[in-house]
A protein has these predicted regions:
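Outer membrane beta-barrel
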Residues: 25-192, 212-216, 220-228, 311-313, ...
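Transmembrane beta-barrel strands of outer-membrane/channel proteins
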Residues: 41-49, 91-95, 126-128, 181-187, ...
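Sequence/structural signature of outer-membrane beta-barrel proteins
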Residues: 46-50, 96-98, 114, 131-133, ...
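Outer-membrane beta-barrel translocator domains and adjoining extracellular loop/strand segments
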Residues: 51-57, 98-106, 138-141, 193-201, ...
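Residues that define the transmembrane beta-barrel architecture of outer-membrane proteins
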Residues: 67-74, 100-103, 161-165, 211-215, ...
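Detector for outer-membrane/organellar transmembrane beta-barrel domains
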Residues: 228-329, 392-393
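Outer-membrane beta-barrel "beta-signal"
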Residues: 255-257, 345, 368-394
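C-terminal hydrophobic structural anchor segments
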Residues: 310-361
Length: 394
């Protein structure tokens, strides 16, 4: 795995070094005969301290960091658009301290209408990509307002979200207001399976062979409330087997509301308020957390939600708060409650230093604890428009 990571790093450095314009933030790299490629780098490093870590079970859902320094990720993205026909492509590589992986690598057919007028309102994606389930799962961690993902997402979608191998079709009917339907099918490909909340907990869906699939339907709409504010509403689903060698299934149902406000043409002040809920209807599941973790229990329904409000009140300062709860209902598992608050100093739109505090309440026999994060996140370069999901209103 380290050799694989070294090879990816060498390839990335060679690509960047191949052009004298590599440092430019507004230009892609010019590669002879092959047109333009947009390149960006994103570094995410933090220091974390937990209260009395000897008494904390670090298998708890929601803790992707360890005590001390963490190289959360160092991302390299290569994106572009072909001139011959309407196709965009993207590859997002993630480097950690001891391994490297492909976060996304896909082809995006954004103008199918040029192939046939019947397909004018359709788009398609094939490859490894982030599933359209809610808003949060679609963005990369450098766009997170806080250092860690919400508990409900970690529980059902994994600590870094779902981004498996498959295909997706979206349809935007030619009506007003805007509405979009999407349907994606994903399998594990060469990966171990569906992302689990922790290394020792069973995943929401069991993906053992290439024939095991998870289907993700979604519908969403977007409304311009005023010249400075907009509102997005979405409903998502996921269907798949929940145990190996079984036909028992889990159905995920999600809803999300995203409100954004920005004052005029400047990047500040602005508000981003995101609320999402996920519920799992499970047929005889293997329990993920609590006293019965790892055991098969009777059918149940378990769900959770979070609400996160970020406010950039000046050119350099932003404050964020999040409240989250898993246990509505709790089914066969323990309830979970966490409150987080963060303050960030923005050196630029792509470089920031943050301090975050979180309180994780008692969950079953796991005692409550506190955590403090110091995060440094910096980016360089540019991404081809249309190949990534961005929630910031600037």
């Amino acid at each position: 795995m380290r050799r694989y990571g070294l090879q990816l790093g060498v390839i990335g450095l060679l690509v960047v070094a191949s052009s004298p314009d590599a440092f430019a933030h507004t230009k892609g790299l010019t590669l002879s005969r092959f047109g333009l490629i947009d390149v960006s780098l994103q570094a995410n490093v933090d220091y974390v301290n937990f209260s009395d870590p000897k008494r904390v079970d670090f298998d708890k859902i929601g803790d992707r960091q360890q005590k001390g320094f963490n190289l959360t990720s160092f991302d390299l993205s290569l994106t572009g658009e072909t001139a011959e026909f309407p196709l965009k492509f993207a590859m997002f590589l993630t480097f950690e301290q001891d391994r490297a992986s492909i976060e996304e690598a896909f082809l995006f057919f954004h103008k199918l209408g040029e192939f046939s007028s019947v397909l004018s309102d359709f788009q398609a994606t094939v490859g490894q990509f982030r599933a359209k389930f809610g808003q949060f799962n679609q963005i990369h961690d450098h766009e997170w307002f806080l250092d860690d993902a919400p508990l409900s997402h970690v529980k059902f979608l994994g600590p870094d979200g779902v981004h498996l191998l498959g295909a997706e079709v979206t349809y935007q009917p030619p009506i007003s207001p805007f509405i979009q339907f999407s349907l994606s099918v994903q399998s594990k490909g060469a990966l171990d399976g569906y992302p689990a909340a922790t290394p020792s907990t069973p995943p929401t869906f069991a993906l053992q062979t290439a024939d095991d699939l998870v289907v993700f339907p979604r519908v969403e709409t977007f409304l311009d409330l005023t010249d400075n504010a907009d509102l997005s509403l979405g409903a998502s689903g996921a269907i798949g087997k929940n145990k190996p060698k079984s036909e028992d299934r889990t159905y995920l149902i999600g809803g999300d509301v995203l409100y954004r406000w920005k004052s005029g043409a400047q990047a500040y002040p602005y508000i981003r308020w995101l609320t999402e809920g996920i519920w799992a209807v499970r047929k005889d599941p293997i329990v993920v957390a609590g006293a019965n973790k790892g055991l098969q229990m009777g059918s149940d329904v378990v769900g959770g939600a979070f609400t996160e409000l970020g406010y950039r009140f000046s050119r350099h300062w932003q404050v964020t708060g999040r409240f989250e709860y898993v246990g509505i209902p709790k089914g066969n598992e323990d309830e979970d409650l966490r409150v987080s608050g963060g303050l960030r100093y923005l050196l630029s739109s792509v470089a920031k230093i943050g301090v975050q505090y979180e309180y994780h309440a008692q969950s079953g026999r796991d005692l409550p604890y506190h955590a403090v994060f110091i995060q440094f996140n910096v980016g360089l370069g540019t991404v081809t428009p249309g190949v990534g999901k961005f929630l910031d209103p600037f």
